[in-house]
Amino acid sequence: LVCSEMCIRDSYTAICKRLSADENLKTACSEYPGIRILKQDEWETLCSFIISQNNNIPRIKGIIGRLCENFGDKLPGGGYSFPSAEKLASLESDDLAPLRAGFRNKYIIDAARKVAGGEVNLSALRNASDNEVRESLLKIKGVGAKVAECTLLFGFGRVDAFPIDVWVRRVVGELYPNGLPECMDGVRLSLIHI
C-alpha cells in the first residue's frame, strides 16, 4: 500500500537522470531529492480538486475538514473518513452550506451523482486510456482541464498528466520561452499556451 500510495516503485534515479539534461530541472532534482507524487483515492482526489478551484490552501483544508466532519464516518482513534460519492449524491447543494464552499457545492453534488450513478465510473476508468479518463471527468460540472489533469495525476497515478495553473504557466513561460527542453518529450503539455 505504501509503495503504491507514494509511487515508491517509480525509478527516481532514472527520472532525474533524464531530466538532468536541462539545467533548471537538474537543479530541481538536486535541491529536492526523493520528492514523490502522492497517489490518492480517485474520488477523494476528484472532490478535493473541485474544492481547490480559485481557492487557497488553508481554505481548501478547512472545506475538506468540514466535509469529512459533516458527512464522513467517525474513525477509531479520532477524525473522520472522506464521505463516499454515494453519501453525497443523496444530498442537495444547500445541504453543503456548512462547508462554506460557495459555488463549488453544486459541482461537488454533480460529481457525486455522476460517480455514484455510474455515468463516471472511477473503477472502470482505472483501465482506460488517459484521454478516456479525461473525457469522462470533463462530463462533470465544474471540472475543467486543470481538475481533470490533477485527478489523472494524483488519483489515477498517470504520471504523463501535467496540471497547468496560472503559476505553472508563468514559470514555464519564463524559464522556457521557446518551448520545453527535449528531456520533457512525451509529457502532455497541450494545455500550455505560452
Regions found by a protein language model. Give the residues of each.
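HhH-family (HhH-GPD) DNA N-glycosylase catalytic core used in base-excision repair
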Residues: 2-192
